[in-house]
Amino acid sequence: AEAEEISLSDIQEGDIVSITLDEDGNAASITVMSMEMDGQGQSGGDEQGAPGQGGPGGQSQGVDSYTAVNEYIEDTTISNETIESTGTDENAALISSGANVTLDNDTITRTSADSQGGDNSSFYGVGAAVLATDGTAYVKDGSVTTDAAGGAGLFAYGDGTVYASGTTVKTTQDTSGGVHVAGGGTLYGWDLDVETNGESSAAIRSDRGGGTMVIDGGNYVSNGVGSPAIYSTADIAVSNASLTANGSEAVCIEGLNSIHLYDCDLTGNMSDLDQNDNTWTVILYQSMSGDSEVGNSTFQMDGGSLTSENGGVFYTTNTESTITLNNVDINYNDDNEFFLQCTGNTNQRGWGQSGVNGA
């Protein structure tokens, strides 16, 4: 979309304002994301939905091409339709070539017994139901359901941006995040209902290359082992939402990345696993996998509640970290081991070199 001039009177309560700063700290662009979800977000600068600066980690060349049931390369609106994908490692809807595509009250399904999942799905969105790589997807109401390895629900990669409002997202298999960014992608969500059931399938998920996620309202549940409510290798802000991990820690932040929570109810129930030194509810760490840049991990929570169903509360290892809490109701489990543990680790998970991987 072309840049337009707007005034303060054009901004309504509930809109999200994104400001990108230049090297001198001056505003280079200002983008207003309207809660109306009409696909007409107005920008006062050169870019719309500019990606954030989550720690990028190791960058790679991406995939040569994608396979999709429907690839949208021009502006269009699809309303009240069913989009089905049953192919191996394919997308149901792929938005590219700078297209602005509105998916309004559609039923989108992705089912495959032969899909592989893995890094191509986590890093680039191969096999996601809805994938925006170069363009903007406006997803309003409707549902997105996947039963395939690597079957993320909504995925923004690279120059892709996803706006989603009132949509139900449910994924079943492994490596299938609910809403997902990587490679600098951008995703904004309002009042979503997200549930994941596989391993490595955070309800709110990011991976190599980082990006920006801003979410307001809704319910986000992960049920799998190794599937937090939020997994951050990006800059992620969530407000007024319920965030629950039934088989994992509630939050995982890796490296130079951040999570900011405002008036959220956050719950974690991490499984006891032999490969871990102990059990926690929020972890800030550096895995050394190359998925995130080394640096300070930031967790901020303002208002709301934090409930630990198993193990300690905050655990940080092999990284610098900043944890800020303000007016948060903290609920401990009966066997709580610690509130905060800053420590090295035995390196069973490959998190740095034992003896020099403290926090």
Segments predicted by a language model, with ranges:
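Generic N-terminal leader segments that precede the first folded domain
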Residues: 55, 85-86, 106-108
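Surface-exposed loop/turn motifs in large extracellular/passenger domains
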Residues: 61-80, 95-114, 125-146, 151, ...
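Beta-strand-rich domains and repeat architectures in extracellular enzymes and scaffolds
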Residues: 83-97
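Residue-level detector of short, conserved catalytic/binding motifs and their immediate flanks
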Residues: 91, 152, 177
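Aromatic-rich beta-strand patches that line glycan-recognition/binding surfaces
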Residues: 340
